[in-house]
Amino acid sequence: MSIMDERLLSGESAYEDADLEYSLRPQTLRQYIGQDKAKHNLEVFIEAAKMREETLDHVLLYGPPGLGKTTLANIIANEMGVNVRTTSGPAIERPGDLAAVLTSLQPGDVLFIDEIHRLHRSIEEVLYPAMEDFCLDIVIGKGPSARSVRLDLPPFTLVGATTRAGALSAPLRDRFGVLSRLEYYTVDQLSAIVERTAEVFEVEIDSLAALEIARRARGTPRIANRLLRRVRDFAQVRGNGTVTMEITQMALELLQVDKLGLDHIDHKLLLGIIEKFRGGPVGLETVSATIGEESHTIEDVYEPYLLQIGFLQRTPRGRIVTPLAYEHFGMEMPKV
């Protein structure tokens, strides 16, 4: 099992998150907290499409995991007053799988493809005419007698979500009329989300406790809600049920989540570079071997937050731990 699968601070969705996220999910843009730039633009594009009685242009949502891409896709469908059909890149293995989904759509529907960067190129080619001309080219028969038949599709909106926009092919990326990058949330925004989630849980929470959870949630709502669930457990077992500052600090310390939202994996990565490679530079593959995790997981899951808070640098020569990280661990940088 990958250590990411057990990680409390992973932005990736876990099985136990699914039902919770559905119950917490806002239904409209007005209810949606954060992502103001993306939200305001979508409000305009949706309203304009409704005024023209057209489908919304295809939308690409990209950014780190756990920031609300799936939630926004569902909100887009709600705001347009249409149904949403959800699938993912890995689930579409053959062109026929995509054809089955496309032909089941009703006029105006939203098709949400999560992890769209994982679509095979042969499937992307089927998607091009569907996105551009609302038609589907299928091949009937094999060999010399094979012929291509074009089927008309109802107008629809494709909403694609990805954590790796750069992995999309240029022809696919260019077919999206709306591109929205989702950013990490501020502490105040996350605190508001934590308090809203506490209301849904019917648990009392101090405003200072909500802020403390928000500060350690790595700018990610999914992590904030997950931390609140665990702190709530401590409040019920070790306290009187109210999530106080004292309970929150105790719980997060026992969960090995430090004041900046770093956990044992972050410590292992940073301290591994500091102690074994004098802070770097060190290559990604070497870091991978050092902590026993795949390089793409390090690059896509672990490093973004460390880069965001300035604890790590990516350079042509490799990864370098910054003075801020040394200061956080109470260590002195080696002299050159």
UniProtKB/Swiss-Prot annotation:
Region (Small ATPAse domain (RuvB-S)): 186-256
Catalysed reaction, written as an equation: ATP + H2O = ADP + phosphate + H(+)
Record carries keyword Ribonucleoprotein: no
Subcellular location, record wording: Cytoplasm
Binding site for Mg(2+): T70
One Pfam family matching this protein: AAA_lid_4
GO molecular function, one term: ATP hydrolysis activity
Record-linked InterPro entries: AAA+_ATPase (IPR003593), AAA_lid_4 (IPR041445), DNA_helicase_Holl-junc_RuvB (IPR004605), P-loop_NTPase (IPR027417), RuvB-like_N (IPR008824), RuvB_C (IPR008823), WH-like_DNA-bd_sf (IPR036388), WH_DNA-bd_sf (IPR036390)
Binding site for ATP: L24, R25, G66, K69, T70, T71, E132, D133, F134, R175, Y185, R222
EC number annotated for this UniProt entry: 3.6.4.-
Keywords linked to the UniProt accession: ATP-binding, Cytoplasm, DNA damage, DNA recombination, DNA repair, DNA-binding, Hydrolase, Nucleotide-binding
Sequence segments annotated as region (Head domain (RuvB-H)): 259-336
Region (Large ATPase domain (RuvB-L)) location: 4-185
SMART domains hit by this protein: AAA
SUPFAM superfamilies, A to Z: P-loop containing nucleoside triphosphate hydrolases, Winged helix' DNA-binding domain
GO cellular component, one term: Holliday junction resolvase complex
Domain remarks: Has 3 domains, the large (RuvB-L) and small ATPase (RuvB-S) domains and the C-terminal head (RuvB-H) domain. The head domain binds DNA, while the ATPase domains jointly bind ATP, ADP or are empty depending on the state of the subunit in the translocation cycle. During a single DNA translocation step the structure of each domain remains the same, but their relative positions change.
Quaternary structure annotation from Swiss-Prot or TrEMBL: Homohexamer. Forms an RuvA(8)-RuvB(12)-Holliday junction (HJ) complex. HJ DNA is sandwiched between 2 RuvA tetramers; dsDNA enters through RuvA and exits via RuvB. An RuvB hexamer assembles on each DNA strand where it exits the tetramer. Each RuvB hexamer is contacted by two RuvA subunits (via domain III) on 2 adjacent RuvB subunits; this complex drives branch migration. In the full resolvosome a probable DNA-RuvA(4)-RuvB(12)-RuvC(2) complex forms which resolves the HJ.
Protein name: Holliday junction branch migration complex subunit RuvB
Source species: Bacillus cereus (strain ZK / E33L)
Gene: ruvB
